[in-house]
A protein has these predicted regions:
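Short C-terminal tail/terminal secondary-structure segment
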Residues: 111-113, 164, 242, 253-281
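Alpha-helical segment proximal to the catalytic Tyr-Lys
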Residues: 144, 188-189, 250
Length: 281
């Protein structure tokens, strides 16, 4: 029968990712880690970014142990100078940049969901900085390098929270929705340079963050309200990222792809204040 290396080689050729140079931001754990690993399996050389050196180095080591090429690049993506230095390092050590997957972005510590009237300036500033601003800084630095190379593909990981009202989570949902709109503007501007820009929005995914934030009762309620009666898995999102950044999607740009097991279709999804382990009132 066919061996796994042979199958992966065929996949790499088919997807057009063989020998591509890739940066994956926010790839030290969870969804970002899985995306970095799948892109490497498809034949790419991957730069793994995370704020924590131990996590970036661990994922890069996993990829290397699997027989692919990877380096760790540590940077705080809220710092424009650090982002520029990170992208320059990727270009120098890998040889260029063809694909960028920006998974960096989160709900900052201490900014847990709360009623809209309890959001203050510092909350808005931190949440927008950690989600919209980091996306813009990374996207700009990546696009500049891709323009020099004659094209590329940029993918942003946003959130299913941008597709419906998100009570008690207004700031995060608004920041992620802004990234979706940023994608359309970038796609129009960068298209003539051969650069595609897209976003994918995961539904509730079983990550360490979700496990820590939601009670078992809330997670059960979310599953029950989802048409497919399940949460999204890391590897499903990773495979979608491979598709969107590959040659199979070379006519797709400026798009926002929802991957939520059908949660968007449900009208009975629990509000964000139901089942949180941390109090918001």
């Amino acid at each position: 029968g066919r061996t796994m290396p042979f199958i992966l080689l065929r996949m790499a050729v088919y997807f057009g990712i063989t020998f591509a140079y890739i940066i994956a931001t926010g790839a030290g754990a969870g969804i970002g880690r899985e995306i970095a690993r799948w892109l490497a399996r498809a034949g790419a050389s991957v730069a793994v970014n995370d704020l924590r050196p131990d996590r970036a180095e661990a994922v890069a080591a996993e990829i290397t142990d699997d027989g692919s090429t990877a380096i760790a690049v540590v940077a705080d993506c809220r710092d424009e100078t650090a982002v520029d230095a990170m992208v320059a390092t990727v270009a120098d050590r890998l040889g260029g940049l063809d694909i960028a997957v920006n998974n960096v972005g989160m709900l900052p510590p201490g900014r847990q969901p709360r009623p809209f009237v309890r959001y203050r300036y510092d909350d808005w500033h931190d949440i927008i900085d950690q989600n919209l601003v980091v996306a813009a800084l990374c996207g700009r630095a990546e696009a500049e390098l891709m323009i020099e190379r004659g094209g590329g593909s940029i993918l942003f990981v946003t959130s299913g929270e941008t597709t419906r009202p998100s009570p008690y989570n207004a700031a995060y949902a608004a920041a992620k929705a802004a990234v979706n709109h940023l994608v359309t503007s970038m796609a129009v501007e960068l298209g003539p340079a051969g650069i595609r820009v897209n976003a994918m929005a995961p539904g509730t995914t079983m990550t360490e963050t979700v496990a820590a934030a939601f009670t078992p009762e809330r997670m059960a309620a979310i599953v029950e309200a989802t048409p497919l009666r399940r949460m999204v898995e890391h590897d499903e999102l990773a495979r979608l990222a491979v598709f969107l950044t590959s040659d199979l999607a070379r006519c797709i740009t400026g798009q926002f792809l929802l991957a939520d097991a059908g949660a968007f279709l449900s009208r009975s999804r629990p509000a964000n204040d139901e089942g949180l382990t941390s109090p918001i009132r």
